[in-house]
Amino acid sequence: ADLGCDFLASGTHKWLFGPRGTGIVWGRDWEPVAPIVPSFSAAAFNAWQLGGEPTASTADLVTPGGYKAFEHRWAMPQAFAFMMGIGKDRVQQRTQELATRLKAGLAGISHVTLATPQAPELSAGLVCCAITGMQPLQAVERLRAKKVLTSVTPYSHSLLRFGTSIVTTPEQVDLAIKAVEELV
């Protein structure tokens, strides 16, 4: 409610350290929303994404996805309790501190173009950039060899993506900056 949004949908394993593959949906007012049953059929999802009709067999389209992972649901209260025990303000401060450190370090490297805004109020723990003369996937592979884990953004214009969180140390941020400096 503090965000001022009407609905929020989010995965919970990255920011909350909840079970992988679990998410939440929160809504301010559910009355005007028609319930839907999500399909686990790749053909149905792809057809929806492309604005067409699914071509899968009837059996594939009506299978609801199997048995619920109750252990994931049961773990969510503990994940929220863990995060609330640390404190939302402390989590935000630590994540912002590390992301700011990373952005400042990357911005000072001549072959890096920072895509994430440097202003702390305009970003969170994800930091994205481009490396001059290098594809993002190539940078991921070269950084992995230096013990720095990154990923590629899943968009048509992809970027190199770093993530900071409360389990990231300042030393790991500095190692990432040094590894990027050595890429070219």
PLM region spans:
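Active-site PLP attachment segment
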Residues: 3-50
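Glycine- and other small-residue-rich loops at beta-strand/loop junctions that grip anionic moieties
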Residues: 14, 65, 165
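Short beta-strand-to-loop capping motifs
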Residues: 27, 129-133, 164
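Structural motif of enzymes handling amino- and sulfur-group chemistry
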Residues: 48-103
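Short amphipathic alpha-helical segments
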Residues: 58-60, 123-127, 158-162
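Conserved PLP-binding catalytic core of the aspartate aminotransferase-like
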Residues: 88, 96-146
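PLP-dependent enzyme catalytic core of the Aspartate aminotransferase-like
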Residues: 137-184
